[in-house]
Amino acid sequence: MYEHESCGVRISVSPDYLEDESTPEEGRFVWAYTIEIENTGKQPVQLIARKWMITDANGRTEHVQGMGVIGEQPVIEPGGRFRYTSGAPLPTPSGFMSGSYEMRRGDGESFAATIPDFSLDRPSDRLWLH
């Protein structure tokens, strides 16, 4: 699991390789990632928009941005959490993702909450140190 806290928002990411959805012989590798956003501050926060950089093993980067996540712009109360799962296909067997959420506090102040960088690796390709 990958985790980062900034501006009173803790973001945790857990990626999973989807072997059944992937077709390596066709250059299609698919991951699901589950994100939990926790409000550690004293005011409600609302997720307004997202920005992603998705980089494959060849160094090709795709920028993705849009309003909300999975069709929602959730309001997260102090101490509350919001969790969702989404997916990312790549043409290579590994890569990484990074990004941020545009958030708005209850008082109207906007800020960027950093999503921790996380790697997309097939379990069979991970290197293990002995």
UniProtKB/Swiss-Prot annotation:
Q: Which residues form the ApaG domain?
A: 3-127
Q: Could you tell me which species this protein originates from?
A: Maricaulis maris (strain MCS10) (Caulobacter maris)
Q: Where does the UniProt annotation place the signal sequence?
A: none
Pfam families membership: DUF525
Supply the name of the protein.
Protein ApaG
Q: Which InterPro entries match?
A: ApaG-like, ApaG_domain, ApaG_sf, Uncharacterised_ApaG
